[in-house]
From Swiss-Prot:
Its EC number is 2.5.1.-. It comes from Nectria sp. Keywords: Membrane, Transferase, Transmembrane, Transmembrane helix. GO terms for cellular component: plasma membrane. This is Polyprenyl transferase ntnF. The lineage of its organism: Eukaryota, Fungi, Dikarya, Ascomycota, Pezizomycotina. Pfam families: UbiA. It is an enzyme of class 2 (transferase). The gene is ntnF. Its cofactor is Mg(2+).
Amino acid sequence: MAAAGARHYTSKDGSQHDLVRGIWKLLRLHTPEGLSTASIGWLALFFYAIQQQLSFESLRYTFLGIFACYQITHGVFCMWNDICDRDFDAQVARTKKRPLPSGMVTYTEAMVAFIIGLALSLGVTYAMLGEDVTLTMGPIWGLSFIYPLCKRAIWAPQAVLGLTMAACVLPPWVALGNDATNAKLPASLFGAIFSWLVYLDLIYASQDRPDDEKAGVKSLAVFLGDKLKACLTVLGALQIAFFAVAAFEASASSFLWVFGIAVWAISVPWSILSLNPRDRNSGGRIFLVNAILGIYLAAVSGTDVWLSSR
C-alpha cells in the first residue's frame, strides 16, 4: 500500500497516478517472487556448505549478502521488464493493470527508479559480498537486461531467463572462496535451476498464450502449442536428475534426500498433470506452488546444514 500522505491523482485518461504504490509494485515487493529468487542463492550456498562441511553460523553474513543482493536485483530487473513490456502489457488481460500501462507510474519515473535501483544493487553487492562476487554478478545483470528484449527477437526467451537464474548459483560458490576446479556441484545445480526455470516460466506463460499470440509476443509457450506438456515432462525429468546429481556430489544426508529431492520429484508430475492450458488461472496457481517449492528446498538444505553443525 502507498504510504500515508503519498501524492496521487487521476490522469487525463482516467487512470490513478500513485508513485509510491506504483514503484512498490514495479519492484514486486507485494509478492514473494523476490524471496523465491534469493532462495536459489541460498539453496546453492547450503549445498556448497554441506559438501565443504561448513557450519551454519559461518554462513550468516554470506546468507544476508545473498538476500540483499538478489532481492534488490530481482526487483530492479522486474521493473526493467515492465518498462520494456509496457506496450505489450497493455494488450494482455492479466498485465494491463500493471503500474505503467495503467498510468500509476510514468515512463520517466520508472526509468529514474530503475537507474537508482541498478546503482544500489551494484553498491550493496560490492559492500556485502566483495569484488569477486560483484564481478560474478555481471553476467546475471547483463542477461537480466537483455531478457525482455529477447521477447521481440527469439521464440525462446525462457531460455535466456533460465540462464539468468541458473547463473545465480555461481556467486555463492565464489563467496565461499571456491574456483573453477572441481566444479561438478555448481554445474549440476546450474543444470537443475536452468531446467526448473524454463519449466516454471512455461507454466506461467501458458496463462497468457492467447493474448501473446494476438500481441505478437515471442514465447516458447506459443511456439510449442499442444506440445507444451511434452516439453514440460522433459524439463521435469532433467531437473530431477540434476538435483539428484547435486545431492550426490554434496554427499547429502538422508534428510535432504527424503524431504528435499524426493518431495521435489513428486511435485513434478503433479504440476504437469494439474496444468490446464485452457484455464487461465491454472498456470498462475501452479507457478506459485513451484515458487514456494524453491523456498522449501532451500529451507530443507539449510536445515540439513544446521543439523550437521550441532
